Amino acid sequence: MATLSEAYTETPLHLQHIIPIDFDSVKEVPESHSWPRSGDESPRRILSLDGDHFSLPAIDLDSPDAIKMVGHACKVMGIFQVTNHGIPSSLLREVESQAWQFFSLPAIAKVRAVRSPGGATGYGVARMTPFFNKFMWHEGFTMMGSPLEHAREVWPHGYGKFCEAMEDYQDKMKALSERLLAMILKYLGISEHDIDWPRLRSNPCSALQLNSYPQCPDPGQVMGLAPHTDTFFLTILHQKDSAHGLQFHREGRGWVPVFPMDGALVVNVGDMLHIMSNAMFPSVVHRVITNEKRHRLSMGYFYGPPMDFRVGPIHRLMQTSGQEVAARFRSITVKDYVQMKAKNLDKALSMIRIR
Ligand code: OGA
Ligand code: NI
């Protein structure tokens, strides 16, 4: 069974594109991390006129209309929040606290968990770093299942609580992802016979990504996470209370901030759901700015199909109301798409688009 790490072996990274700077030791923003002050790439550029007053809809998953609302939000925005999601707040606090413990360590200790050049898991900067001229004000820790291999390098005798919290969180996030995906398919009128549901669920490709955006001497100069779309079906994001920074891009509106809402999780559509829905659901472009003088933490759970699964527009979706709708994408295995994205980032989607 292919793994995500195997998909990355063809695109190994240099250590300079893995190991973050020592954020504790910088007194001013280095040139390497200073983004343009104007232009499309500028972190300062917020086109949204009324963005500050916009709040992303929160859908109560226990509501009788939840399926309709989730489907509608996927179609119109590609991003929404959910409440009554079943993830205990005690678990969210515990994962936050474990993540803080890790990111508060000195740089020399964190680097013991460093991601390998062709690997997918461990400590490091965002994998898309080589595609940009400047570095991001960000450090991350990625895991797929048990983080034991990395955690025990960091805490040889005290990794138990960290691993336990991360594994429990991933189990519950997986169940929530399946619940959301089932709701979305139901909204689309897709039955479990229309797609290979048992196989889709049997060995899903998923990852938990802890993100840390350290305090910055001049937040307006740096980019937390550069604009991107997520690769898999969907992402479920928890933002630690008061520290906001996530923004998504809306046509005609610009960058819209997503303020953390107590008890709510952010869900966004990724490339693979965009492909399977035959472009009905947008794979939402988002970024993170470090606009506050405080350390920000978030936890993203990425949920996708197994590595050898073929993603393509769902056949049944193209035969609605007696009319044949043309497929907008050719189908591709998850592994090939992940590799294509590792080599081409945002160009990957257009490479499989049928014109
Ligand atoms: C990501 C991401 C947003 C955030 O990890 O892909 O978009 O708020 N994170 O940290
Ligand atoms: Ni993302």
Residue spans of the language-model regions?
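Peripheral, non-catalytic segments flanking oxidoreductase cores
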Residues: 1-355
